[in-house]
């Protein structure tokens, strides 16, 4: 599969996975791969605590105002990567601005009125954010929008919010907004989800459960699943170190690494059997800091793994 084709098969890619699986790092790598394939890319984060900017060497936190993380036009011919954070308050202010209520918008948001409304109509905060994503998709602001979704448990609730409001609100702009968000989420040409997991038993169990919930309850198409943090396969781990002073330590290290490889291989196979989706494999990075160099490394691995896949097929 061509990496450019993978990135261009939909307009919005929602990256979803359990907390701790490297979802934001995968988002950064995906954006870099898409940009190198010539697609202008907008990353949208919804929780504002991901540290996404630092992956591109940015020291300031992202805000509602769009910023450029990586300008295009470099030696590699990559397109630009931009990013922003979406919050319900800011989305509400902008919505009111656009509907002729500029004078009261900031006062309404700063008064905490949105929290009162959210209590009366659960899901309203999420629909404000998703409504803005829908607006960005319609505006053609970028070739690809990548949404760094909330952690898996909240992701399903987040994406289900439109269905809940559609059931609760019978008429008016909120219902119209909810229906338009559902139209976005259920159109594979406009929106798909890319799942992220680790090659471990519990994360694999959780990503399988999340996948079926997203398909059954939200009706969204799944682009594939990223298996993050794979150790490189080492050969000759059963070689005898002989009588070297470090022999016992070497045997123990080799046994640990072999057990790790066997476990990861087993979980990757189990995931493929439980979830028949394209798999993207990304390596474990032996570092605690992820910056531009690491993002480039993962983007190359991402592209290589995509290139090894067969031609795309939409899973709906």
Over which residues does each language-model region extend?
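C-terminal accessory extensions appended to soluble enzyme cores
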Residues: 281, 289-316
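ATP-hydrolysis module of ASCE/P-loop NTPase motor domains
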Residues: 94-137
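Conserved catalytic-core segment of NTP-binding enzymes
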Residues: 4-5, 25-29, 36-37, 42-45, ...
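Short, surface-exposed amphipathic charged segments that create phosphate/polyanion-binding patches used
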Residues: 96-103, 237-242, 293-302
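N-terminal phosphate/diphosphate-binding loop that engages ATP/GTP or pyrophosphate donors
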Residues: 32-110
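Pre-Walker A (Motif I) flank of P-loop NTPase domains
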Residues: 8-13
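Conserved glycine(s) of the Walker
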Residues: 22
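Residues at the beta-strand->loop junction immediately N-terminal to the Walker
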Residues: 15-18
